[in-house]
């Protein structure tokens, strides 16, 4: 029983709410892309477009989310462009991860964030493939619950100029002006 309790403690993730500058998140994603794309045979271009805003969230979980999106994209060895852009939407920042190299039907996009045994195949021994979007969905759910403002969401849609986009929203850090200052 003690071992089970210790294992549960190790598996628990504590949500550490902090204020994170959006440019820092995107720079970390770009650095990660450069590191993992070295071994990819196809020529994939990754570009970022940021905003001068900060979000409220867990920096480690958000790095993991962006790394999952990059890993999933690079799993498909097709040349082309991937973009990560941001925009302000009221009290949220919308992150748009666009893979312009491949198309997905509306039906495929609707199923991305749900378990699918055909997609979740065993890659290397003991490692599941195709679970990246499920992990991203859980991270955004955690942010919706613990980041201090409800309304975080994640979804996928066809991209305007071809390909498809996964977008997610995080609460903007709204600076509070102190009275008398």
Task: Write out the residue ranges for each language-model feature.
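Short, small-residue-biased leader/transition segments that mark boundaries at the very start
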Residues: 1-5
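Conserved micro-motifs of the catalytic ATP-binding
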Residues: 10-15, 54-57
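A conserved beta-strand-to-alpha-helix junction within the catalytic ATP-binding
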Residues: 16-31
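Conserved catalytic submotifs in the C-terminal HATPase_c
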Residues: 18, 43-53
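Conserved polar catalytic motif of the HATPase_c/GHKL fold
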Residues: 67-72
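Short beta-strand/loop element within the Bergerat-fold HATPase_c
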Residues: 81-91
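Short conserved segment of the HATPase_c
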Residues: 104-118
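Conserved glycine-/histidine-rich ATP-lid loop and adjacent helix of the Bergerat-fold HATPase_c
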Residues: 135-151
């Amino acid at each position: 029983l003690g071992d089970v309790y210790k294992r549960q403690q190790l598996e628990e993730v504590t949500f550490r709410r902090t204020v994170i500058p959006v440019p820092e998140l995107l720079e970390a994603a770009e650095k990660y892309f450069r590191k993992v794309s070295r071994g990819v045979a196809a020529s994939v271009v990754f570009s970022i477009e940021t905003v001068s805003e900060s979000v409220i969230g867990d920096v480690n979980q958000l790095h993991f989310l962006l790394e999952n999106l990059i890993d999933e994209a690079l799993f498909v060895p097709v040349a082309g462009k991937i973009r990560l852009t941001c925009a302000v939407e009221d009290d949220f920042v919308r992150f748009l991860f666009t893979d312009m190299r491949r198309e997905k039907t509306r039906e495929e996009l609707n199923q991305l964030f749900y378990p699918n045994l055909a997609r979740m195949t065993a890659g290397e021994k003991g490692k599941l493939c195709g679970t990246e979007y499920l992990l991203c969905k859980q991270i955004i759910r955690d942010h919706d619950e613990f980041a201090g403002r409800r309304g975080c969401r994640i979804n996928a849609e066809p991209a305007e100029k071809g390909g498809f986009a996964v977008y997610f929203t995080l609460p903007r850090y709204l600076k509070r002006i102190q009275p008398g200052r």
